[in-house]
C-alpha cells in the first residue's frame, strides 16, 4: 500500500518481519514458554508496555520506502536507531520535483517549537510566490551548471531544501514508537507530522495489540489522541 503525502511525497511499507506474536514469543523465551491464548498474549503485551519492558518489541521490524523533501529527511535521520539508504545526488541528476506548500505558517511567540497557519491571504500569496520563484531559480542554475560540465557533486550545492529525496528506512517497533512520540506531536514540524501519522496507521494495522498498548501506556505526543 502507498500513502500519498504532501504534494509529491509517499510512504510505502515494503517489508516486515514479525508482528504482535513476535514480541510475545521474545518475552516468553526466557522461561521456555511460547504463545498461549490470544487474551493472555494481548495481556502480556500490555504488561510489557506498562512496565517499560521494551526489548521484546525490537523483534518486530519494518522497512519503509519514503519520498520526502530533504528538510524532512534530515529531521528523520536524527532517529539513529535504524538503517537508512538514500538516493545519491552525486551519482544521479535531480528531477524537477520540489515541495511547494499550500499554506504558510508563522512562529508562536509563547512556544518556539510551534507554528500556526497564516490567515492573511495577501501575505500568504506573497510568501508562496517568493518560495516558488526561489525554487525555480535554484533549479535553473543547477541545470545550467550541469550543461557547463560541472560535476553533479558540485552542482547540487545550489539546490534548495525543498528538493525531494527518496530513502529506505528499516526500523524495529521500539524505535518506531520513539519516532511517533517525537514526530506524531504538535511540536514537530507539520510536514514530518504527516509522515508520522501515516506510519501510525500502518503500525496500527500490522500490530494492533502493540499499537493499542503503546497509546495507553507509552505515547507521549498529542496528535494520535486528538491533539491539534
Swiss-Prot record:
Its cofactor is FAD. It is an enzyme of class 2 (transferase). Pathway: Pyrimidine metabolism; dTTP biosynthesis. Binds 4 FAD per tetramer. Each FAD binding site is formed by three monomers. CDD domains: ThyX. A motif (ThyX motif) lies at residues 78-88. FAD binds at residues 55, 78-80, 86, 172-174, 178. Residues 1-217 form the ThyX domain. One of its GO terms (molecular function) is thymidylate synthase activity. NCBIfam families: thyX (TIGR02170). Catalyzes the reductive methylation of 2'-deoxyuridine-5'-monophosphate (dUMP) to 2'-deoxythymidine-5'-monophosphate (dTMP) while utilizing 5,10-methylenetetrahydrofolate (mTHF) as the methyl donor, and NADPH and FADH(2) as the reductant. Homotetramer. This is Flavin-dependent thymidylate synthase. The lineage of its organism: Bacteria, Thermotogati, Thermotogota, Thermotogae, Thermotogales.
Amino acid at each position: 500500500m502507498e500513502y500519498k503525502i504532501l504534494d509529491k511525497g509517499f510512504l510505502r511499507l515494503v517489508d516486515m518481519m514479525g508482528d504482535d506474536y513476535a514480541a510475545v514469543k521474545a518475552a516468553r523465551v526466557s522461561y521456555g514458554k511460547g504463545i498461549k491464548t490470544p487474551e493472555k498474549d494481548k495481556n502480556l503485551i500490555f504488561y510489557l508496555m506498562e512496565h517499560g519492558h521494551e526489548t521484546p518489541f525490537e523483534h518486530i521490524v519494518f522497512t519503509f520506502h519514503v519520498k520526502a523533501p530533504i528538510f524532512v529527511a534530515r529531521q528523520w535521520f536524527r532517529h539513529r536507531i535504524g538503517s537508512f539508504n538514500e538516493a545519491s545526488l552525486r551519482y544521479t541528476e535531480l528531477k524537477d520535483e520540489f515541495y511547494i506548500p499550500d499554506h504558510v505558517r508563522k512562529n508562536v511567540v509563547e512556544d518556539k517549537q510551534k507554528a500556526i497557519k497564516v490567515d492573511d491571504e495577501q501575505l500568504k500569496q506573497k510568501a508562496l510566490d517568493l518560495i516558488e520563484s526561489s525554487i525555480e531559480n535554484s533549479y535553473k542554475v543547477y541545470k545550467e551548471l550541469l550543461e557547463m560540465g560541472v560535476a553533479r557533486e558540485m552542482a547540487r550545492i545550489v539546490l534548495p531544501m525543498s528538493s525531494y529525496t527518496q530513502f529506505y528506512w528499516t526500523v524495529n517497533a521500539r524505535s518506531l514508537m520513539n519516532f511517533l512520540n517525537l514526530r506524531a506531536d504538535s511540536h514537530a514540524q507539520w510536514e514530518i507530522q504527516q509522515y508520522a501519522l501515516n506510519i501510525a496507521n500502518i503500525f496500527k494495522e500490522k500490530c494492533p495489540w502493540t499499537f493499542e498498548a503503546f497509546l495507553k501506556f507509552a505515547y507521549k505526543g498529542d496528535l494520535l489522541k486528538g491533539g491539534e
